[in-house]
UniProtKB/Swiss-Prot annotation:
Species this chain originates from: Tityus costatus
Protein name per its UniProtKB record: Toxin-like TcoNTxP1
Residues annotated with Cysteine amide modification: C81
Tissue note: Expressed by the venom gland.
MF-aspect GO terms: sodium channel inhibitor activity; toxin activity
Places the protein is found: Secreted
Lineage: Eukaryota, Metazoa, Ecdysozoa, Arthropoda, Chelicerata
LCN-type CS-alpha/beta domain location: 21-82
């Protein structure tokens, strides 16, 4: 029984560590992907196009879970949206 609990705990830890990053996906201009006035499921589809595991509308922008490390994610510290 102890081994089963240890095994399950290890699997959960691996999922947390390997789960990927999360955040607001950035478009080619560095802006968040908007979900203002979009259909239900839009953000989940957009996130999956960027190889994320899932996503939802955190109004007014999409938020993704399980993004690959190479995915571009919006960051307030390096925000270039609307700047020249």
């Amino acid at each position: 029984m102890k081994r089963m609990i240890l095994f399950t705990s290890c699997l959960l830890l691996i999922d947390i560590v390997v789960g990927g990053k999360e955040g607001y996906p950035a478009d080619s201009k560095g802006c968040k992907v908007t979900c203002f006035l979009t259909a239900a499921g839009y953000c989940n589809t957009e996130c999956k196009l960027q190889k994320a595991s899932s996503g939802y509308c955190a109004w007014p922008a999409c938020y993704c879970y399980g993004l690959p490390d190479s995915a571009s994610v919006w960051d307030s510290a390096t925000n270039k949206c609307g700047k020249k």
